Amino acid sequence: VIMIGVENAYPMGLNTSNVRKFWERGARYVSLSHNGHSQFTDSNTGEFDGTALHNGLSDLGKEVVELLNYYGIMIDISHPSKEGIRQMTELSKAPVIASHSSARALRDHPRNVDDEQLNWIKENGGVIQTTALGFFLTDREDPPANMDDFMDHIDYICLLYTSPSPRDLH
C-alpha cells in the first residue's frame, strides 16, 4: 500500500480550508507537527528544552482534528508532544496512527511512545507501525541495532495491545 502523507501540517497555514485542498491532492494521513512545534500542536522535541507553545493542541489544532476526521484523513501521532497525542486520541472520532514510532519502555527516545501513550492509542482503536531505524530501537552502538531489537519492539507493543486495558477491567 502506498499513501500520500504530510509529515508536518505547518504548510497548511492558518486557513482550515487548506485541509480540503490537501485531501484533494491525495493526502491520506497527516502529522500535525514534525521536528518542531507548529500552529496546530507542540512537537515531542519540546522534551529536549522543556518548551511548549500550546500545552498540546492549539484551538486551531482542535479544529483541524475535526476536519481531518471529516475528510477521512488519518492523524499521525509520531511527532507531536505527549499532551498533544493525549488530546488527539481523545478528540479524534477515528483511529489514529503512529506511522513510525517504537516502544519507549525499550528505548527511551522522545519519538517513541510510552506505555501510557500506547494505551491511549489502543483505547482510540489506533495502529502503531514500528520503525526499524536503529537509534529508535536501542542506544547500543556496537553491535548496532538488529532484527531482534526490531522484533522486541513489535512483541512488546503486541503484548501491551493484547492485555486488558484499564477500561476493560471496569
Explain the meaning of each model-derived region:
Residues 1-140, 151-160:
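Extended, charged catalytic domains and RNA/DNA-binding interfaces, predominantly
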Residues 143:
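Active-site/ligand-binding-proximal alpha/beta "capping" segment
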